[in-house]
């Protein structure tokens, strides 16, 4: 799947190789949140930190290990959404992990770890495509989708992507 251009604030970027140790820090433009990509040369983890707390570590996701990734040139980027509550990690412009500080939830392509604790990501770190929405530009259907959502019941599901808008609904919702 090819993703459109990311519509968010780029705060950190680094070229690297899997076998290289490094730390890439991406401070939120506003507030106390920080997203960090750290590699020890064998594994790469993406961390959610909140410097306003006594224990800043909030959550973490495995991004790669040496066995699962080719040791070649990559570019990592950390983005923040408009209200500085969600961080996105891309590698070679492909979304790999997202932290939502408001919902206390994280997801990544590896889905690992299943869960770190009860306060963040209680359902684990499986990839959630919907979490990417805050980092993508508006689709051509944005206004139409908003109007349709107002008209449809809670039984409707919308998939608002470019180039298509999919609306699934239960016919009984319109009969009741």
Residue ranges of model-derived segments:
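Long, intrinsically disordered, low-complexity acidic/Ser/Thr/Pro-rich regions
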Residues: 2-23, 152, 163
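Surface-exposed loop/turn elements that mediate protein-protein interactions on large endomembrane-trafficking
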Residues: 3, 46-68, 98-118
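Blade-terminus and WD-like Trp-Asp/Gly-His loop motifs, strongest in beta-propeller folds
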Residues: 12-31, 38-40, 79-84, 121-139
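Short, well-structured hydrophobic secondary-structure segments
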Residues: 24-71, 77-79
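Loop/turn residues immediately N-terminal
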Residues: 94-96
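Acidic, proline/glycine-rich low-complexity IDRs
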Residues: 99-176
């Amino acid at each position: 799947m090819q993703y459109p251009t990311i519509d968010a604030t780029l705060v950190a970027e680094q070229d690297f190789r899997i076998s290289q140790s490094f730390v890439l820090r991406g401070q939120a433009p506003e507030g106390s949140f920080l997203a960090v990509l750290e590699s020890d040369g064998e594994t790469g983890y993406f961390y959610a930190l909140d410097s306003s707390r006594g224990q800043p570590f909030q959550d973490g996701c495995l991004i790669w290990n040496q066995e699962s990734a080719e040791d070649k040139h990559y570019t990592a980027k950390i983005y923040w959404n408009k209200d500085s509550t969600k961080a996105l990690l891309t590698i070679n412009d492909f979304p790999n992990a997202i932290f939502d500080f408001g919902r206390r939830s994280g997801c990544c392509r590896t889905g690992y770890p299943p869960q770190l604790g009860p306060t963040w990501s209680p359902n684990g770190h499986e990839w959630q495509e919907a979490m990417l929405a805050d980092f993508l530009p508006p689709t051509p259907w944005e206004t139409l989708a908003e109007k349709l959502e107002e008209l449809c019941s809670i039984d409707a599901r919308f998939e608002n992507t470019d180039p298509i808008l999919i609306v699934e609904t239960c016919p009984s919702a319109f009969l009741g």
